[in-house]
Each structure stands twice: as structure tokens, then as C-alpha cells.
Amino acid sequence: GFITIDRTEALTAIDVNTGKYTGNNNLEQTVFKVNKEATTEIAKQLRLRDIGGIIIIDYIDMHEEENKKEIIELLAQSLKKDRTKSQILGFTKLNLLEMTRKNMCNNDDY
């Protein structure tokens, strides 16, 4: 899978895609695996690119609530290495994950 990061003045949108990854026959498990791998990379990219403010993550749709909870826990765990304070607000009704990350510098290169 791969992620796309779009920064605007209002917020940063991160889109998770499967790419050519097909995995096994269980679609939910394939989606969950791609989303888990993306979560670790997203936390890393937030630090490397010093992305702050409102962040919306558009994961590949997961239908099992337990998988969504695991993604939130993994993101929280991955962000613990980050000195910048983040707050994960959870999934919206549109299955978008809302979070905020404190802006540490004025970064105008959208």
C-alpha cells in the first residue's frame, strides 16, 4: 500500500491506498494489514515533515470495530516516540480518523 499526504492551510489530509497489494482472500484482514502498515508510516511522516494542526486520515474502510480500535491504539503507540503533543479524536461517521498535532514551527510550504 501507499499513503498520499495533502497539506492545505486548513488541515492535512492523509489518504491510505492498497496499491497493487492484494494479500490473502480475506478482504477485511488485507485492509487491516495495509492500514496497520500505513499507521506506522504516517506517525513517522508526521515527525519527519513536522506536520501539525488538524490531521484527517482516510484509511481504507474497515467494517470491524475491533480493527478500528487497534488502529487507534497503534497510532497512539507510534506517536509516543514523538516529542510533539498529539491528540487522537477517533473515527468519524465517514470513517475518517481525526487527530491534532501541535504546530512547533511556522511551516508554510504546503
Residue ranges of model-derived segments:
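Conserved glycine-centered short motifs in functionally critical loops
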Residues: 1-110
